[in-house]
């Protein structure tokens, strides 16, 4: 029985005669004798002869139904009282230990047999259930206790990852290596919650060394073919890591482009899609190979995609050169950008937004090589007036104060232009005495988008 057909039956609980025969054979084979530790005698018999629901329940939570039910019935306010909180904490730990014990048994079964590729997805199901259980019950735990359970959970999941990674079976149909991505996604999710950059780096190095981060090779991965959501999650974490931590924006936008192109249209209003498109827009702008004036979506769009994309304020600022609104955007969301790891990227985009303003003024000036700073200041003031609020309104008509304000603005523009020249985004030089910029006649904006 093919792996893909097995997974399909397993997910839908559509148990054909072929599926029952397949599971029955696996249960009776010598390498999988440890299944008796999971199933009781009568349950094993039922699972072997047709009651496959018993097998599924055993793999996922057969020993934990009562504990899980009691946890669901808990009053969330019970965590307020310390004595009840201790009881809840102990119950969560007991359930977690039972779940991880089941997972360790399954890992042994998975490791002992070369032909147990069929068990990869059920093991992932248990890992996913453990991680979901920890996230759902986190409100009952103190921060330190929660982190300890997360770290223990990561170790058990990593064991499943290494079993799949170390499979040397030359028959690719029976090789478990393709399942590494399933477990890697769970690990990266925990590392993100723990904000453990070093462990994320180590895991991605392993994935890079085996070629799993190569987008062209992902097309041949049967797990990613079967589970499109896993492909989206995997490339999201990889793209986020390359962009937020390594500042390799070309690689980052390539992985996020896969996420955008694979994302189901009916879910484009979800926070996941908004998060992906936000990162994709940032990194596409900063990718050195991108020389488009504005970022295009990588595939034919429909109304939902277009709406989700065009509503992005950052992209509008980039297209219009609206430095005022963009500065306000950074100030308003600075804390969130720091948490997400995108603050540095936003500062780099701020430079591009200002560059866009300079280029618009250059075109308005008929592309002459001498560009007065007063013209750039005029463009700056247009956005300044459009962004009308109490803070930005000019409250004085005193000529001296207005002159001082104008001089301060020109000084600020000089500094920002000098920064662009130093970074190679503008080819030219500043004339401080003439308050103008002299641009190259052949290539004034060598790295401009």
Swiss-Prot record:
It is found in: Cytoplasm; Nucleus. It comes from Candida glabrata (strain ATCC 2001 / BCRC 20586 / JCM 3761 / NBRC 0622 / NRRL Y-65 / CBS 138). This is COP9 signalosome complex subunit 12. Component of the COP9 signalosome (CSN) complex that acts as an regulator of the ubiquitin (Ubl) conjugation pathway by mediating the deneddylation of the cullin subunit of SCF-type E3 ubiquitin-protein ligase complexes. The CSN complex is involved in the regulation of the mating pheromone response. Belongs to the CSN12 family. GO terms for cellular component: COP9 signalosome; cytoplasm. Pfam families: PCI. Gene3D superfamilies: Winged helix-like DNA-binding domain superfamily/Winged helix DNA-binding domain. One of its GO terms (molecular function) is double-stranded DNA binding. Transmembrane segments: none annotated. InterPro entries: Csn12-like (IPR045114), PCI_dom (IPR000717), WH-like_DNA-bd_sf (IPR036388). PANTHER family: PCI DOMAIN-CONTAINING PROTEIN 2, UNCHARACTERIZED PROTEASOME COMPONENT REGION PCI-CONTAINING. Keywords: Cytoplasm, Nucleus, Signalosome. Component of a COP9 signalosome-like (CSN) complex. Residues 233-444 form the PCI domain.
